[in-house]
């Protein structure tokens, strides 16, 4: 019988060893799980820490005020100057941070760029972990203050300039060239090395600015016009054909043409037809130093020759027109040094301007024209070569025009003529207001002479001219046309050079077209005396045109004790050239109240006396409608009501209590209550004497009691002078009241009025003058050669170029950080809109207005000396205020003002400087000119200038034999005399008879007669 087998289910107990091993295994499992969790958390924390800035970069900046001078090489990161200065500054920054509280976090630094303005440094700081910008700035300032770097012996850093810029970058690993992504300042872009920023307009300009050259990458810079950028080789082409604008914004296509050194470039245009807003600019050179040589639009310019081996061509597309063929240009290289004189001169303008070039220092450019000019009453109807509308000629700018201007055309340098040669040409001078055409010969020795000149209207025909040339040194020929505003076109054609002297001309000498007599008499009659109720008057022929060359006078009268308010109901004069002048009284030396010109409206004018003189003075060019005016009389018209006896009247008419006068707080809106609170009394010069303080309305003399060196310095500063030089007690017999001075704990002065001084001793103080009249950049190593010559850069750091409407018109002198002294006749009629003036400080070359040494400033206030008399040329001085103060540099410094009693004796050699014409009515200088001239006595000057009244307000200088003088364009500039190693402003260039003629000195406003008036603006 089978049986069934079962499995036993009985229980087996564990041994103690088994239990122990099981427990250990469980513990190990728990530990492993814990370690894994901790590791994960650590990794996450590490990632979070990196995200929070475990590696950190900050961008900072500061300004170096001394120890190094800015130069343009600092813009080039590859230059030795950049590398040396960057190395020294990085060493300085490293030393500061490695001795700071951030030494453990700090890694290194990198200088990015230098900017002009003393020297502004931009640099990056690298840290191992995140640091706040406040902490970075604080540690940097503390390190600079504590001189924590050996480099601070050399460099002085402006602590107020230290700042952390907006850029703050953090990364999760150390900064290396392979992974840093740089952020650039506004207006700049990064190079492909991701380490360097350069200005955006430096890309694709023909000059390498990025260390890796990526800013001139041919692929990146390829134009949308034809896909090209850099054109090399002896010939090539570029084009912009059928160029509809591809976007809403303007499009710029730019090409760089580069041929072998020593060669020049000829541009030819197979096709050229663009919309008038789409302009092709042709520049000589590349980069920031390129010079605009031609701007072309609409019609084919023919051939353009650029005398450089590099050309920049820039096509600006503004329109969205699609029916213009654009242009197709080719270029070829040529060697201009192989040209002879005849090839350089001969030109009929059928092939562009041939080898003639536009004068960059004139006021406008010659135009190449086919057919008639703009106006039917001036200029040719056709060229001279073919005598029909198919040929070309050149003309001064056509159209109505807006100003008087010189238009110059220059030859290439010509070789000395071994035998005489005849320069011939055809000229066209037709128009009622045609001025002048001249031919000048100049050489490298700055010698210039006029060899041909014609003035006036010669009718609507081409006239023949010729000049024999016989020069012994290299020279240039210059055609200069002087154009008036309208009806004054001058044209040239068929210029040629032939062997031998010029023979008698086969063509008759042209005769002037008689000038029609003026339609109206220039004498207005009068002067007209006007009394109430006959108070309305107007210019002659109003509202029709007033006469040219008019001089009209109205004298307005009121009863004694009253004054006059003049109101212009209508006003329309030719701007600048025609003026209404208003004076306070009838006498010739009455004060100038206003000069009005241009279109109205104009402000009312108030006299301070019971008489007012109104003058209308016009020139000989244009006339407009004139003016209609009326006047009223009354008591205190336009004058604020006088204040009560216990109040002070501010300059703006406000009244403030006398107790608030000179209390250290401004109560007048114009600040005049704190303007005149301390002065010298009984001194020998304007920087010494007894000290007086105004307390309320009473002047108190300072006691010697408790006087200290610090008080001397504080008082000198209040007086607008330098530090205290010396002080000593004196024992006068003068009565009080007196004032005792003490220094408060916070440094301000405490004034205590007193009826008596201790031991009756007063203080006599002498202050140092503020630093002025010092040359820092260009010291004279040898005595200057007497005669006009190019000045060194920085030789006259106070000489300022004054530009009006973009044209250098006058000079000026810097006398403080925000005030200039110039001539009144420069700004007369140009004073109503000061912002049209721009002062260029630190200027050396007119062709380089963007030099790092130059600083432009708009003018925001013009004050003509109220005693200025234009007709007598007396008191010819004016003040001009800069919109913003200027920082002094090696190239910008103030000149010293003379004492009121300072004498510059006759016979002393002083200096003049300016950019004016180098010959009378010739071309202006590009580089600042300087010369020495001897001073003359006023008696001698009066003998040599008998047609003028030489007053005590004038000083004269010049050689009896002539040859050296100020000239047109130098007006307003300085006459400078040196004393005790400082330069003083002795005179302001005013007037003369022509320029540099024998026994015809230059006349200058004598500045010592105006020192007090000038200083009233400075303090």
From Swiss-Prot:
Its EC number is 3.4.21.9. Residues 54-169 form the SEA domain. Residues 342-504 form the MAM domain. It is found in: Membrane. It is a single-pass type II membrane protein. Residues 2-18 are cytoplasmic. Residues 678-771 form the SRCR domain. Responsible for initiating activation of pancreatic proteolytic proenzymes (trypsin, chymotrypsin and carboxypeptidase A). It catalyzes the conversion of trypsinogen to trypsin which in turn activates other proenzymes including chymotrypsinogen, procarboxypeptidases, and proelastases. PANTHER family: ACROSIN-RELATED, TRANSMEMBRANE SERINE PROTEASE 15. This is Enteropeptidase.
């Amino acid at each position: 019988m089978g049986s069934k087998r079962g499995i036993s289910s009985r229980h087996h107990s564990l041994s103690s060893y088994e239990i122990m091993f099981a427990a250990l295994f469980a513990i190990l499992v728990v530990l492993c799980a814990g370690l894994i969790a901790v590791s994960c958390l650590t990794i996450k924390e590490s990632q979070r820490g990196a995200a929070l800035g475990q590696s950190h970069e900050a961008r900072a900046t500061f300004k170096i005020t001394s120890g190094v001078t800015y130069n343009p090489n600092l813009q080039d990161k590859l230059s030795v100057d950049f590398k040396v200065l960057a190395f020294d500054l990085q060493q300085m920054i490293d030393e500061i941070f490695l001795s700071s509280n951030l030494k453990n976090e700090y890694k290194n630094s990198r200088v990015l760029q230098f900017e002009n303005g003393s020297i502004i440094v931009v640099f990056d700081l690298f840290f191992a972990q995140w640091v706040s910008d406040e902490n970075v700035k604080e540690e940097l300032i503390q390190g600079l203050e504590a001189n924590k770097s050996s480099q601070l012996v050399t460099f002085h850093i402006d602590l107020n300039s230290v700042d952390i810029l907006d850029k703050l970058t953090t990364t999760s690993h150390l900064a290396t060239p392979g992974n840093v992504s740089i952020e650039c300042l506004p207006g700049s872009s990064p190079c492909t090395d991701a380490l360097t920023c350069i200005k955006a307009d430096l890309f694709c300009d023909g000059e390498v600015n990025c260390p890796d050259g990526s800013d001139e990458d041919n692929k990146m810079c390829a134009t949308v016009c034809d896909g090209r950028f850099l054109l090399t080789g002896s010939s090539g082409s570029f084009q912009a054909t059928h160029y509809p604008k591809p976007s809403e914004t303007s499009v710029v296509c730019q090409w760089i043409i580069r041929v072998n050194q020593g060669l020049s470039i000829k541009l030819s245009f197979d096709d050229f037809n663009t919309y008038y807003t789409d302009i092709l600019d042709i520049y000589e050179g590349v980069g920031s130093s390129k010079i605009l040589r031609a701007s072309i639009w609409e019609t084919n310019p023919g051939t353009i020759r650029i005398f450089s081996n590099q050309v920049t061509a820039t096509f600006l597309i503004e329109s969205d027109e699609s029916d213009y063929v654009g242009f197709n240009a080719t270029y070829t290289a040529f060697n201009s040094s192989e040209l002879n004189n005849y090839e350089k001169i001969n030109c009929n303008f059928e092939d562009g301007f041939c080898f003639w070039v536009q004068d960059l220092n004139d006021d406008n450019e010659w135009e190449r024209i086919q057919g008639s000019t703009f106006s039917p009453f001036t200029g040719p109807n056709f060229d001279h070569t073919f005598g029909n509308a198919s040929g070309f000629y050149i003309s001064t700018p056509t159209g109505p025009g807006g100003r008087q201007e010189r238009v110059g055309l220059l030859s290439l340098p010509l070789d000395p003529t071994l035998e005489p040669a005849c320069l011939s040409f055809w000229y066209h001078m037709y128009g009622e207001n045609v001025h002048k055409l001249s031919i000048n010969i100049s050489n490298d020795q700055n010698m210039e002479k006029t060899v041909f000149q014609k003035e006036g209207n010669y009718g609507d025909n081409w006239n023949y001219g010729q000049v024999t040339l016989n020069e012994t040194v290299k020279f240039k020929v210059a055609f200069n046309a002087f154009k008036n505003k309208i009806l004054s076109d001058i044209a040239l054609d068929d210029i040629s050079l032939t062997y031998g002297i010029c023979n008698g001309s086969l063509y008759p000498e042209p005769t002037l077209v008689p000038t029609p007599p003026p339609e109206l008499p220039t004498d207005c009659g009068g002067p007209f005396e006007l009394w109430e109720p006959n108070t309305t008057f107007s210019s002659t022929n109003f509202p029709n045109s007033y006469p040219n060359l008019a001089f009209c006078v109205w004298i307005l009268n009121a009863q004694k004790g009253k004054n006059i308010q003049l109101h212009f109901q209508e006003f329309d004069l030719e701007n600048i050239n025609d003026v209404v002048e208003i004076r306070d009284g009838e006498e010739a030396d009455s004060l100038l109240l206003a000069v009005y010109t241009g279109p109205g409206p104009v402000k009312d004018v108030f006299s301070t006396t019971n008489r007012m003189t109104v003058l209308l003075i016009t020139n000989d060019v244009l006339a407009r409608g004139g003016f209609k005016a009326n006047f009223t009389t009354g008591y205190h018209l336009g004058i604020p009501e006088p204040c009560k006896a216990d109040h002070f009247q501010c300059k703006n008419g406000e009244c403030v209590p006398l107790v608030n006068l000179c209390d250290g707080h401004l109560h007048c809106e114009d600040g005049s209550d704190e303007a005149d609170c301390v002065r010298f009394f009984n001194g020998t010069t304007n920087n010494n004497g007894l000290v007086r303080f105004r307390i309320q309305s009473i002047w108190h003399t300072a006691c010697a009691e408790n006087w200290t060196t610090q008080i001397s310095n504080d008082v000198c500063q209040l007086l607008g002078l330098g530090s205290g030089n010396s002080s000593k007690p004196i024992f006068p017999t003068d009565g009080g009241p007196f004032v005792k001075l003490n220094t408060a704990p916070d440094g301000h002065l405490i004034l205590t009025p007193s009826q008596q001084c201790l031991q009756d001793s007063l203080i006599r103080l002498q202050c140092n003058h503020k630093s002025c009249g010092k040359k820092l950049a260009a010291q004279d190593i040898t005595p200057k050669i007497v005669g006009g010559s190019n000045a060194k850069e920085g030789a006259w750091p106070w000489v300022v170029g004054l530009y009006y409407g973009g044209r250098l018109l006058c000079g000026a002198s810097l006398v403080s950080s925000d005030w200039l002294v110039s001539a009144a006749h420069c700004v007369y009629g140009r004073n109503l809109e000061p912002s049209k003036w721009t002062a260029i400080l630190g200027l050396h070359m007119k062709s380089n207005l963007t030099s790092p040494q130059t600083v432009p400033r708009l003018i925001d206030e013009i004050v003509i000396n109220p005693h200025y008399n234009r007709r007598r040329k007396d008191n010819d001085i004016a003040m001009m205020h800069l919109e913003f103060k200027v920082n002094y540099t090696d190239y910008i410094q103030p000149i010293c003002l003379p004492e009121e009693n300072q004498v510059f004796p006759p016979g002393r050699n002083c200096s003049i400087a300016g950019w004016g014409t180098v010959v009378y009515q010739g071309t202006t200088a590009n580089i600042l000119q300087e010369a020495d001239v001897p001073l003359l006595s006023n008696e001698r000057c009066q003998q040599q200038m008998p047609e003028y009244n030489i007053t005590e307000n004038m000083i004269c200088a010049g050689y009896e034999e002539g040859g050296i003088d100020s000239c047109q364009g130098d007006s307003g500039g300085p006459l400078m005399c040196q004393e005790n190693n400082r330069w003083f402003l002795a005179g302001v260039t005013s007037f003369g008879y022509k320029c540099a003629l024998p026994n015809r000195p230059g006349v200058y406003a004598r500045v010592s007669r105006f020192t007090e008036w000038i200083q009233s603006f400075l303090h």
